[in-house]
Amino acid sequence: MTAIPLGLPGVPVRPIAERRVSRRIQVGPVAVGGGAPVSVQSMTTTRTSDIGATLQQIAELTASGCQIVRVACPTQDDADALPVIARKSQIPVIADIHFQPKYVFAAIEAGCAAVRVNPGNIKQFDDKVKEIAKAAKDHGTPIRIGVNAGSLDRRLLQKYGRATPEALAESALWEASLFEEHDFRDIKISVKHNDPVVMVEAYRQLAAQCDYPLHLGVTEAGPAFQGTIKSAVAFGALLSQGIGDTIRVSLSTPPVEEIKVGIQILESLNLRQRGLEIVSCPSCGRAQVDVYKLAEEVTAGLEGMEVPLRVAVMGCVVNGPGEAREADLGVASGNGKGQIFVKGEVVKTVPESKIVETLIEEAMRIAEQMEKDGASGAPAVTVS
């Protein structure tokens, strides 16, 4: 009997960059900024006035790992639904307000954890800041100043000609200064654009000129594939420089998919402890097994596993054994069979038809032992 240490860290490894120093605000129980972990959020796609459907979608988002959720509030019926939704939601609810300032006050009174305001389209917003600041301060409600390229203040469009990085940053800082005049600084800021290059530069300028926590987002990023690429590029560029305190991946998909992508981005940058990670080769003429099918079946079989486990699925003898040895669990396939590795040690060889079943069984065994040993221990698997 041999005990093989798994080598799985109990804490995240060093992140890609030192975090930008920023203020900390509380969005309900979730800290944002001030060195708090980067949080992942999304937005419901239901009519907020449909309380049951909205709470159901929030429950699905919560189960997927969402930490903060935003709900639209374009009508009085939506505003009337906010108290129940804010009270029954498992995670903090942010009301998203455009056009009508009265809904800002309704959201604050409803007990929402925060309110997003769009200074570019709320009627007479500058004149309402004093009242909004007082109401938010009285209720302890943070405000997100959400500047968006598609609804930029006309004064700035006239000045810059289009939604440039300078225009986005100036808009946000101007509105923040109005709140500051009324001694309100419980603020976070976003400056979103659908072009990742413009968006990245806008956030860089903003980060250099203020210490407010920043909400990262590429607006109208597009369908799943395109939106994922845009968000990964933009967030990676900023988070790798320590810029960003909470993220929302905008996709034209069910919102749960946004959370999956957001979590993967943070894990890839070591800003969150990694969960299950499948490493698989892209396949080539050397492959002696259907790598695509194998990787998909292993991924499906381990879906929902939360332990930090790296599983390598390799299709040939060139890189297969080396990659499998580097993983916590892996298979190197060839000649109709697969060598199963646990932390660099070959524990068994199985027929090709048994590879998926064996990998899933071994992963479950490792996960069970990790849970038994506790998150802070140094788990090991015993093989004979």
Swiss-Prot record:
Gene encoding the protein: ispG1
GO MF entry, a single one: 4 iron, 4 sulfur cluster binding
Chain's role: Converts 2C-methyl-D-erythritol 2,4-cyclodiphosphate (ME-2,4cPP) into 1-hydroxy-2-methyl-2-(E)-butenyl 4-diphosphate.
One Pfam entry name: GcpE
SUPFAM superfamilies: Dihydropteroate synthetase-like, Nitrite and sulphite reductase 4Fe-4S domain-like
Pathway participation: Isoprenoid biosynthesis; isopentenyl diphosphate biosynthesis via DXP pathway; isopentenyl diphosphate from 1-deoxy-D-xylulose 5-phosphate: step 5/6
Record field: catalytic activity: (2E)-4-hydroxy-3-methylbut-2-enyl diphosphate + oxidized [flavodoxin] + H2O + 2 H(+) = 2-C-methyl-D-erythritol 2,4-cyclic diphosphate + reduced [flavodoxin]
One GO-annotated biological process of the protein: isopentenyl diphosphate biosynthetic process, methylerythritol 4-phosphate pathway
UniProt entry keywords in alphabetical sequence: 4Fe-4S, Iron, Iron-sulfur, Isoprene biosynthesis, Metal-binding, Oxidoreductase
InterPro entries referenced in this protein's UniProt entry, alphabetically: Dihydropteroate_synth-like_sf, IspG_bac, IspG_bac-typ, NO2/SO3_Rdtase_4Fe4S_sf
The protein, known as: 4-hydroxy-3-methylbut-2-en-1-yl diphosphate synthase (flavodoxin) 1
UniProt keyword annotation of Oxidoreductase present: yes
Similarity field: Belongs to the IspG family.
Co-factor remark: Binds 1 [4Fe-4S] cluster.
Documented EC number(s): 1.17.7.3
Cofactor(s) the protein requires to work: [4Fe-4S] cluster
Keyword set includes Iron-sulfur: yes
Binding site for [4Fe-4S] cluster: C281, C284, C316, E323
